[in-house]
């Protein structure tokens, strides 16, 4: 990694953080912040994968719909889908979602995960999350406790072998059932 060209490395990685950084301007301009020369077709494809296509199709002006600073005229989940689309328009080899889907409901999150697995560029997705629902279908889950790795495996494997994961899983399941 140390010998790898930083610019080349950054071109292969898309990062979406919990903070939803949207700018005053059109949907098109906000998505092109991820790839300046993105065509409308590429933008629509990124929006579709990010589960934001229908939302934008319903806005007057569609790609020319003007977002307020920080996307204040969108809901939290809509803002998250927009920032995910911005990262996807670059077709990164690695996509890091740092609690980036925390405002998505379970169905939208599941649809996003399915769409990411079926993209034509199939990125490696690294999801950082405190929500079991966001990661339970991941190929590999790494469980941290106070900065230490205490478990690694699939959801089913961790439920059998990692007490920390099982406690988190059970507590979140109880909240969903309540």
Predicted regions and their residues:
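ABC ATPase nucleotide-binding domain helical subdomain, centered on the C-loop/LSGGQ "ABC signature"
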Residues: 3, 10, 28-69, 114, ...
């Amino acid at each position: 990694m140390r010998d790898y060209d930083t610019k080349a490395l950054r071109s292969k990685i898309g990062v979406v953080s919990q903070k939803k950084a949207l700018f005053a301007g059109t949907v098109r301009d906000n998505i092109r912040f991820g790839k300046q020369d993105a065509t409308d077709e590429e933008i629509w494809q990124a929006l579709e994968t990010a589960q934001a296509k229908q939302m934008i199709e319903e806005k007057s002006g569609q790609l020319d719909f003007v977002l307020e600073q920080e996307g204040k005229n969108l809901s939290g989940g809509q803002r998250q889908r927009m920032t995910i689309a911005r990262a996807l328009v670059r077709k990164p080899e690695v996509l890091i979602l740092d609690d980036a889907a925390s405002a998505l409901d379970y169905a939208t999150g599941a649809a996003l995960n399915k769409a990411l697995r079926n993209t034509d560029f199939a990125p490696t997705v690294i999801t950082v999350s405190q929500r079991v629902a966001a990661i339970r279908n991941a190929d590999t889950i790494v469980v941290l406790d106070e900065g230490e790795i205490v478990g690694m495996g699939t959801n089913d494997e961790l439920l059998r072998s990692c007490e920390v994961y099982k406690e988190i899983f059970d507590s979140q399941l109880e909240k969903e059932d309540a």
